[in-house]
Curated annotation (Swiss-Prot):
Belongs to the cyclophilin-type PPIase family. PPIase A subfamily. Disulfide bonds join 62-161. This is Peptidyl-prolyl cis-trans isomerase A. GO terms for molecular function: cyclosporin A binding; heparan sulfate binding; integrin binding; peptidyl-prolyl cis-trans isomerase activity. It is found in: Cytoplasm; Secreted; Nucleus. Acetylation at Lys-125 markedly inhibits catalysis of cis to trans isomerization. PPIA acetylation also antagonizes the immunosuppressive effects of cyclosporine by inhibiting the sequential steps of cyclosporine binding and calcineurin inhibition. Acetylation at Lys-125 favors the interaction with TARDBP. Glycans are attached at residue 108. The modification N6-acetyllysine is found at residues 28, 44, 76, 82, 125, 131, 133. PANTHER family: PEPTIDYL-PROLYL CIS-TRANS ISOMERASE, PEPTIDYL-PROLYL CIS-TRANS ISOMERASE A. The modification Phosphothreonine is found at residue 93.
Length: 164
């Protein structure tokens, strides 16, 4: 089985920035990967298209996926509002790692983050389910609009997304 690839076309205040593609590790975390894949295609009638990265901390990560409230308090999975941590096989080994944001154990919804550094203190707490395949330079460009408290200086959105 080949792991799926999805893409995000990123915009800054409505202006195109570029494309980021992700390999989703369906071979290790099938349920978590399928959630992200389906939210990227929008095939369930809801998903990431048009949503923003509400929290960007340079040298740490870019967080998005709250397509219901757009501020980090919302979002939902394809399995219902929340789903359990699938496993912690994969680790936060460095830049480009794609992992689930949560509010504690077994609270996965749709929020995710892209690491821009090694974040080993998150191992065993957040489910890693993918990695940047192409476009890490776009993620690095997104970082420039972040701040230490995570507030972004411009609106960073997923203008389009889907499966390749």
């Amino acid at each position: 089985m080949v792991n799926p690839t999805v893409f995000f076309d990123i915009a800054v205040d409505g202006e195109p920035l570029g494309r980021v593609s992700f390999e989703l590790f369906a071979d290790k975390v099938p349920k978590t990967a399928e959630n992200f894949r389906a939210l990227s295609t929008g095939e369930k009638g809801f998903g990431y298209k048009g949503s923003c990265f509400h929290r960007i901390i340079p040298g740490f990560m870019c967080q998005g996926g709250d397509f219901t409230r757009h501020n980090g308090t919302g979002g939902k999975s394809i399995y219902g509002e929340k789903f359990d941590d699938e496993n912690f096989i994969l680790k936060h080994t460095g830049p480009g790692i794609l992992s689930m944001a949560n509010a504690g154990p077994n609270t996965n919804g749709s929020q995710f983050f892209i690491c821009t550094a090694k974040t080993e203190w998150l191992d065993g707490k957040h489910v890693v389910f993918g990695k940047v395949k192409e476009g890490m330079n776009i993620v690095e460009a997104m970082e420039r609009f972040g701040s230490r408290n995570g507030k972004t200086s411009k609106k960073i959105t997923i203008a389009d997304c889907g499966q390749i």
